[in-house]
């Protein structure tokens, strides 16, 4: 594909930095040494919690929430700086660090996150995920969602979500007209239809989201994301 200056402009406008952020891949599971102090018994509001001292199979269902800008940059229980754009989570007792698959039981969307913080300590919520994870799970506007969490043991296959249809959110808009215009331009510039992948507009609570998919595997979704990243890289580096 020959990139003219007009095409470069259109590509940059059609596929911005925000879209790359929302289309990022899940956390990469790897064996890590458990944090010494973050896994000690602790007390919050008069209640004592005893974190698990090893990564093992574990499943839990309940409500999830997410935390964002107010906590961005603050230290987590694991001593790292919280990044709302990374795929991380807070849990009251799971080992730090460890990995879990979180599945939204309402829409079947799932994401793998790295547990590096403690919480949530209010209401009946079982896990707090980052803003990026909430976006991928499709509940960033609602604030909470009913989820299933499954501990992933490094070296074992990650649990597979029941709904294998995977979508990548490209960008969100306030009106359907804006979303449709973006979809038309993106389809033209990226030739999405030629790869057998469709673009569509989904109306969510307060926004219209242009998404790419469905994909039947994380690998295929990652390939599509890499292709999109490569296209944007070409846009940014072409002279």
From Swiss-Prot:
Keywords: Cell wall biogenesis/degradation, Lyase, Signal
Entry superkingdom: Bacteria
Keyword S-adenosyl-L-methionine included in the entry's annotation: no
Stored InterPro entries: RlpA, RlpA-like_DPBB, RlpA-like_sf, RplA, SPOR-like_dom
Ranges of residues in domain SPOR: 160-239
Gene Ontology biological-process annotations: cell wall organization; peptidoglycan metabolic process
Signal peptide positions on this chain: 1-25
Transmembrane region(s): none
EC number: 4.2.2.-
Enzyme class: lyase
GO terms of molecular function: lytic endotransglycosylase activity; peptidoglycan binding
UniProt xrefs under Gene3D superfamilies: RlpA-like domain (2.40.40.10)
CDD domains (UniProt xref): DPBB_RlpA-like
Family: Belongs to the RlpA family.
Annotated HAMAP family: RlpA
Cross-referenced NCBIfam families: rlpA
Function as written in the Swiss-Prot or TrEMBL entry: Lytic transglycosylase with a strong preference for naked glycan strands that lack stem peptides.
Protein name per Swiss-Prot or TrEMBL: Endolytic peptidoglycan transglycosylase RlpA
Organism (species): Neisseria meningitidis serogroup B (strain ATCC BAA-335 / MC58)
Lineage: Bacteria, Pseudomonadati, Pseudomonadota, Betaproteobacteria, Neisseriales
């Amino acid at each position: 594909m020959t990139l003219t200056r007009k095409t470069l402009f259109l590509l940059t406008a059609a596929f911005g930095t925000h879209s790359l952020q929302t289309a990022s891949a899940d956390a990469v599971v790897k064996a890590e040494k458990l944090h010494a102090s973050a896994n000690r018994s602790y007390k919050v509001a008069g209640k004592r919690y005893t974190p698990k001292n090893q990564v093992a199979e574990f499943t839990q269902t309940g409500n999830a929430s997410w935390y964002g800008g107010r906590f961005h940059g603050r230290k987590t229980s694991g001593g790292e700086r919280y990044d709302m754009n990374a795929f991380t989570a807070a849990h009251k007792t799971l080992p730090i660090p460890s990995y879990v698959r979180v599945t939204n039981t309402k829409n079947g969307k799932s994401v793998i996150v790295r547990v590096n913080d403690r919480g949530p300590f209010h209401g009946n919520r079982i896990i707090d995920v980052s803003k990026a994870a909430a976006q991928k799970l499709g509940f960033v506007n609602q604030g909470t969602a009913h989820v299933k969490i499954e501990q992933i043991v490094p070296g074992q296959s990650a649990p597979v979500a029941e709904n294998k249809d995977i979508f990548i959110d490209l960008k969100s808009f306030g009106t359907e007209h804006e979303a449709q215009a973006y979809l038309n331009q993106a389809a033209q510039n990226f030739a999405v239809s030629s790869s057998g992948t469709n673009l569509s507009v989904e109306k969510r609570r307060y926004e219209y989201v242009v998404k790419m998919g469905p994909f039947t595997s994380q690998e295929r979704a990652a390939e599509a994301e890499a292709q999109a990243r490569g296209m944007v890289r070409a846009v940014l580096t072409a002279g």
